[in-house]
């Protein structure tokens, strides 16, 4: 039965914490899935969360720790001694442990590592900390199953049992040569059905082996795993020696983080912000784009001021300013959002780019024509035929230009290695406001012969 967290249940937990009723927690909380326990701890104070956390067995503690909200986890770890942190890291996969250590100061890292009892685990974590966090090396884990090509099946099974003690999930066996270079894969099924004296070299798969290098960007890793539908991918160094693997759950977390970042950029927030971030940090993240919007507003005001005489002679021109700016901004954001989504999937070839530009241009022409006819009728009924022509022609041109600009800007940013998600936010809206107003008043002045 699926667990649903309620306020009433949290209230009971808090009461039982006050009473220190450990038997109740064992019966009603510790039996839950670790993801549900993590959801509960996210809602509690640090002391309440620690009380429940240390009632759980060590293996489940590791799962809960990685399921906690990032800010809650950081606050929780900050309340632990370096020895307690070291004990927790020994229960985690090396990549997760390295991620947690990476948030600490150099002095804290040294203290935690020095207090870890498992020297091999400590060495693996230190090794991972040497890689850039945005590369395959920073994403990989050191726990994996490997077999030498010269082993027999029965020896491989014995070795794999020993290796599997530290590996949470086994997807494939990586086959290496005497120099530890990756040469192929072996499925568990094929290993188990092979004769005990058969050599691994006779049964492993050596063709079409997909791997990544430690220096490959993490986004490239995600694209490769998506393309080949992989649940895990081996990681090799520049000599093709096997050094780790990346699993699907790591990539899913990466994709989620990138999606969150792009959404915040599109919303005009310049850095990643958590729900419980400080007021100063939230203000700092939002202010740059608000300033850009303000500057854009000043430019728009300047454009309007240049046509002050025309507005004085034809005041009804001012009525449709919001329509022009809002429509241009919406069209630009729609076009840029489609292009950004396409670029995120790796579609950045020249042919594909020209196709996008042509398609968005045609969409702009079609939508512009339909909207122009509609607005002409409305303006004609409530104002005059001349104003109807001004608004409809302007709207048509603005929609087409906005569609093209919304397509081009993400492509230009991507070409210059700038995150194209920037183009889906206030930047594109502000730019289209200025251009749209210029087009609108220029058409108005021409048709009214001012």
Question: Which residue ranges define each predicted feature?
Answer:
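Hydrophobic packing positions in regular secondary-structure scaffolds
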Residues: 1-266
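Short leucine-rich amphipathic alpha-helices used at interfaces
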Residues: 8, 14, 19-20, 26-27, ...
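Mid-bilayer segments of alpha-helical transmembrane spans in multi-pass integral membrane proteins
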Residues: 108, 112, 124, 399-400, ...
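Extended alpha-helical regions
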Residues: 155-158, 435-443
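Cytosolic juxtamembrane regulatory segments of multi-pass membrane proteins
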Residues: 212, 431-438
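Ser/Thr-centric signal marking residues that sit
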Residues: 247, 429-432
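Alpha-helical transmembrane segments and their membrane-interface boundaries
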Residues: 258-396, 400-404, 408-422, 426-430, ...
């Amino acid at each position: 039965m699926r667990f649903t967290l309620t306020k009433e249940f949290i209230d009971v937990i808090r009461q039982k914490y006050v009473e220190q009723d450990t038997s109740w927690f064992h019966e009603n909380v510790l039996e839950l899935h670790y993801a549900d326990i993590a959801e509960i701890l996210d809602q509690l104070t640090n002391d309440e969360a620690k009380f429940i956390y240390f009632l759980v067995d060590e293996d489940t503690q590791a799962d809960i720790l990685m399921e906690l909200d990032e800010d809650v986890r950081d606050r929780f770890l900050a309340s632990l001694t370096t020895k307690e942190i070291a004990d927790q890291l020994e229960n985690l996969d090396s990549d997760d442990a390295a991620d947690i250590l990476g948030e600490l100061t150099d002095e804290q890292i040294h203290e935690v590592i020095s207090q870890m009892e498992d020297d091999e685990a400590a060495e693996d974590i230190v090794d991972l900390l040497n890689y850039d966090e945005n590369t395959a090396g920073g994403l990989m884990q050191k726990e994996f199953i490997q077999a030498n090509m010269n082993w027999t099946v029965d020896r491989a099974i014995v070795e794999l049992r020993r290796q599997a003690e530290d590996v949470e999930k086994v997807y494939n066996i990586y086959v290496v040569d005497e120099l530890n270079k990756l040469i192929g894969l072996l499925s568990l099924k094929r290993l188990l059905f092979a004769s005990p004296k058969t050599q691994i070299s006779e049964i492993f798969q050596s063709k079409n082996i997909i791997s990544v290098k430690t220096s490959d960007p993490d986004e490239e890793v995600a694209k490769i795993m998506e393309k080949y539908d992989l649940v895990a991918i081996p990681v090799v160094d520049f000599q093709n020696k096997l050094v780790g693997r990346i699993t699907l759950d790591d990539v899913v977390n990466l994709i989620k983080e990138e999606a969150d970042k792009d959404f915040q950029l599109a919303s005009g927030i310049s850095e990643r912000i958590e729900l419980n971030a400080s007021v100063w940090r939230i203000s700092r993240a939002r202010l740059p784009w608000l300033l850009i919007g303000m500057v854009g507003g000043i430019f728009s005001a300047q454009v309007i001021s240049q046509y002050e005489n025309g507005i004085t002679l034809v005041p009804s021109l001012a009525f449709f300013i919001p329509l022009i700016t809002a429509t241009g901004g919406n069209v630009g954001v729609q076009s840029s959002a489609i292009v950004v989504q396409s670029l995120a999937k790796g579609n950045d070839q020249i042919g594909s780019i020209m196709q996008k530009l042509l398609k968005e241009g045609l969409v702009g022409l079609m939508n512009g024509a339909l909207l122009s006819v509609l607005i002409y009728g409305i303006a004609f009924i409530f104002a005059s035929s001349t104003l109807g022509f001004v608004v409809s022609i302007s709207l048509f041109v603005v929609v087409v230009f906005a569609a093209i600009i919304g397509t081009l800007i993400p492509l230009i940013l991507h070409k210059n290695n700038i995150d194209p998600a920037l183009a889906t936010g206030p930047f594109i809206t502000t730019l289209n406001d200025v251009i749209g107003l210029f087009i609108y008043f220029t058409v108005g002045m021409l048709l009214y012969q001012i």
